[in-house]
Curated annotation (Swiss-Prot):
SUPFAM superfamilies: GAF domain-like, Winged helix' DNA-binding domain. It comes from Nitrosomonas eutropha (strain DSM 101675 / C91 / Nm57). One of its GO terms (biological process) is negative regulation of DNA-templated transcription. HAMAP family: HrcA (MF_00081). This is Heat-inducible transcription repressor HrcA. Belongs to the HrcA family. Coiled coil: none annotated. The gene is hrcA.
Amino acid sequence: MLNERAKILLKTLVERYIHEGQPVGSRSLAKFSGLDLSPATIRNVMTDLEEMGFVSSPHTSAGRMPTTLGYRFFVDTLLVVQSLDNEQITLLENRMHPNNPSHLINVTSRLLSDLTQFVGVVVTPKRMGGAVFRHIEFVPLSEKRILLILVTPEGDVQNRIIFTETVYNQSDLIEAGNFLNQHYAGCALEEIRSGLQHELTQLRRNMTDLMNAAIEIGNAALQESSEAVVIAGEHKLFDVRDLSENLSSLKQLFELFERKSKLLQLMELSRQACGVKIFIGGESDETMLEEISVVTAPYEMEGKIVGTVGVIGPRRMAYERIIPIVDITARLLSNNLS
């Protein structure tokens, strides 16, 4: 357990390192800590902190820099979070209009990037209550191949091919599409499946088979696309000295942005948190790269957590400023979606 003096010096060291990007020496610690200590005493405390794994000393410098453990202790114990000023809150409120969910998600990721100058990330919500369609259409491709076209309430279009044992003519396909659009548009596909069981008296058996196949394939297609990662501001990482000096790490990071699956797993962990969660690079495999930290927060729709927002940047980021931006953005997004 650190005593109060060691905590103050560690806090000062992390703050100066975040601000300057250079190892911090005892003279700088004496100046900014507010403690009336001799350089020798400060060096002794730094030696203790280094032995405990909170700081490290590069061979090329007499100063010290925080380790992953040092960052974690700082964030969990020593950090004083700043409040957003009214101008920033007003900017968020004015630009986050709830007129279109897809547009709102894209705007949110760009806002996070603009306000932090790092990468803004939003995991789009999983569809509530199952996959829903606004319009459905069947297009013949060959005797036993049919193109299924599904349009979601958000305007997304999904195309899938249905392979059938039965040959359907053009009028059959139009009839099936019209029936589903007339009776079930706006309903969850799972609800339609059970509803079709009661329509056997009105529909021919082969038509019911076609519709059930469409429901099964359509449901899978919409669930596949029901969650995605929206990323904005990746290019801003080239302006971050800690990252731009290591092209290998930047390449790995951009590969993660391309694949998105690992990033989605990381963001998914945020759903279990009550409020902001911080992943600091080097702590585990979940944080992707040692030089990267991720600040995330879950957001809600109608009282249920449906996604996460986050900022990806260097470990040497101003956590006291980034955390409230992510927190308030998640709250505003929840309000607009609900």
